[in-house]
Amino acid sequence: MKIISCIEELRDHLRGQLRTAFVPTMGNLHDGHLSLMRLARKHGDPVVASIFVNRLQFGPNEDFDKYPRTFQADVEKLEKEGVYILFAPTEKDLYPEPQEFRVRPPDDLGNTLEGEFRPGFFSGVTTVVLKLFSCVQPSVAVFGKKDYQQLMIVRNMSKQFALPTEIIAADTYRAEDGLALSSRNVYLSPAERAEAPALFQSLNSVANEVRSGHLDIFELERKAMADLSQRGWKPDYISIRKQSNLQPPSAGDMAQGEKLVVLAAAKLGVTRLIDNLEI
């Protein structure tokens, strides 16, 4: 595996490749990330991964400097997965001057759910993804469904900017007890780790109610949040949305069988977890 930080060197190595598959990450890799590499290999060759902790997507109350950096361990994992190039730019490589031009997702996608609680987050994400796409110039890029809103926003950005990159969605990789794998899980205490699967269980309960014909969305969301609160969680949201555009479904949408997704974010102790489940 080649490790490259220079954009021009990266382009030289990839020139002439017909179907490069790309997986962007911020490092601190776990089995969920590695499953994205395997899916990428099914859709393209060579596979390029990136590791870059993107300052632009960190808010004023989110500690950029404390984000886990495990570069050498990440390198070993990517080598075992047969990744061809690891693109690992420094901030100076990727942002040689202040990034004055930013991508701004539409408000109805970027300022709801995660965007409401993390202002500017999706602008930071889409700006760095667009820049990474420009560097790698992939035919396909793989994003996990765990970050469902991010997936939708990146997919819409790629479509509206007519980027020659197909966005592939990867199913959420879960532990045996249902907890979605996340770099944040390392912050959970043993007791919190035992409790953490309750978030996915809550999503399943909501989904089962919808499938059984319960159409009062507000009541389902309210009850699910109250149940988590009683267990010691601090939920930011549990919200039922349309898969197509992440807008709240109308009664007509519900009656007509619109494809839905229930999304959640909640704090357990000091650790904020997110998850979702398609219905």
Curated annotation (Swiss-Prot):
Positions of the catalytic residues: H33
Chief place where the protein resides: cytoplasm
Stored Pfam families: Pantoate_ligase
Keyword Cytoplasm in annotation: yes
Pathway this chain belongs to: Cofactor biosynthesis; (R)-pantothenate biosynthesis; (R)-pantothenate from (R)-pantoate and beta-alanine: step 1/1
SUPFAM superfamilies: Nucleotidylyl transferase
Positions contributing to beta-alanine binding: Q57
Annotated residues for binding of ATP: 26-33, 144-147, 181-184
Binding locations of (R)-pantoate: Q57, Q150
EC number: 6.3.2.1
Keyword set, alphabetical order: ATP-binding, Cytoplasm, Ligase, Nucleotide-binding, Pantothenate biosynthesis
Localization (cell): Cytoplasm
GO terms assigned for molecular function: ATP binding; pantoate-beta-alanine ligase activity
Catalytic activity as recorded in UniProt: (R)-pantoate + beta-alanine + ATP = (R)-pantothenate + AMP + diphosphate + H(+)
GO cellular component: cytosol
UniProt record, GO biological process: pantothenate biosynthetic process
Family per record: Belongs to the pantothenate synthetase family.
Other facts noted in the record for this chain: The reaction proceeds by a bi uni uni bi ping pong mechanism.
Name of the protein in question: Pantothenate synthetase
Organism: Janthinobacterium sp. (strain Marseille) (Minibacterium massiliensis)
Gene name in the database record: panC
